[in-house]
């Protein structure tokens, strides 16, 4: 017996970027395949507080953006428990402060985010000339005063690509061009996701990657630094986007299907209505399963996406009937969220992974 799964969750990585970009665009943006969860709803509530009008008709989110120059006088931004939302918003908070004459903006959250050290986000802000203080260094709440003043900014992306994404979303709003140099970039697929979101909302920038042949412990082919050249004075334009299904969730079902199939419990599993050009890092699970000996096949889904992004949706089948899965080797530097499910997969493979 085979099993089919339709991943109802929208990718938080895709949705949070799209929601913030829609807020910065003056006019209506429509985000299809909207499936609310705490982190996505948190982003929606943030932009509502900035003056955006929000409506939902089932699975489509309608956002009437106010535009970057008309952001509300936000004195406090609440990011819930989302590390991504916090890091995306810290550079934007500095821009809001600058628009409001340098008035302080406080970023806070609740729950686990208050125990997370975000020192790299604070260091990046200070490198950009922003005054950022905290009751306890590196921990929320942050008090951010003044805008980004430096036109050449450099910091490490080793600990998080999310801070880089936050700067890439804010720098186009500045009056002058900025050069951002990111050393030791990590989670590069998520940077690609940010860049695609920016393109969809009319933002342009250039980038150049530099390589050192794998020195410093990096895998050959991984850039040692990326230099982004960001023109200033840009405006976000409204857009219609399809929010891709969440590959982080899909990875668990794909592994479960492969393992259960190899044990003869089921024939396999089919993940319905997935996108193979999503740029989500966790899509790599398909290549990993192939390397373990599982069969991964792709067939067109019976639905398509109205032309907001290239590529239609696919049904993806994973089977390993009557075969033991083989040990694998993978570098998860750029897809760290896969670590837990990869440990489960390794436990069901012959040999040492």
What are these regions, as identified by a protein language model?
Residues 3-4, 8-353:
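Structural preference for solvent-exposed beta-strand-turn elements
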């Amino acid at each position: 017996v085979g099993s089919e799964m339709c991943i109802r969750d929208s990718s938080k990585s895709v949705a949070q970027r799209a929601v913030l970009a829609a807020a910065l665009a003056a006019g209506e943006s429509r985000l299809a395949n909207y499936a609310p969860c705490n982190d996505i709803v948190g982003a929606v509530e943030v932009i509502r507080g900035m003056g955006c009008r929000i409506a939902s008709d089932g699975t489509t989110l309608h956002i009437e953006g106010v535009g970057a120059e008309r952001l509300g006088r936000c004195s406090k931004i609440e990011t819930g428990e989302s590390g991504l939302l916090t890091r995306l918003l810290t550079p934007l908070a500095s821009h809001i402060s600058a628009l409001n004459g340098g008035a302080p903006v406080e970023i806070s959250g609740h729950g686990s985010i208050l125990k997370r050290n975000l020192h790299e986000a604070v260091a990046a802000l200070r490198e950009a000339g922003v005054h950022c203080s905290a009751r306890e260094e590196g921990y929320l709440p942050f008090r951010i005063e003044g805008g980004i003043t430096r036109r050449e900014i450099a910091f490490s992306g080793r600990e998080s690509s999310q801070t880089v994404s936050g700067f890439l979303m804010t720098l186009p709003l500045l009056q002058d061009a900025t050069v951002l140099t990111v050393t030791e970039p990590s989670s590069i697929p998520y940077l690609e996701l940010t860049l695609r979101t920016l393109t969809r909302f009319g933002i342009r920038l250039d980038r150049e990657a530099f390589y050192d042949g794998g020195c410093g412990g990096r895998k050959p082919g991984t850039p040692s630094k990326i230099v982004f050249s960001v023109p200033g004075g840009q405006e976000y334009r409204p857009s219609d986007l399809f929010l891709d299904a969440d590959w982080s969730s899909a990875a668990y079902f794909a592994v479960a299907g492969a393992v259960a199939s190899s044990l003869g419990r089921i024939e396999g599993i089919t993940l319905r209505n997935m996108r193979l050009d999503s740029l989500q890092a966790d899509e790599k699970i398909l290549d990993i399963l192939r390397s373990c000996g599982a069969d991964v096949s792709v067939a067109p889904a019976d639905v398509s996406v109205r032309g907001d992004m290239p590529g239609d949706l696919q049904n993806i089948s994973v089977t390993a009937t009557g075969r033991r899965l083989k040990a694998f080797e993978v570098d998860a530097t750029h897809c760290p969220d896969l670590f837990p499910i990869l440990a489960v997969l390794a436990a069901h493979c012959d040999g040492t992974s």
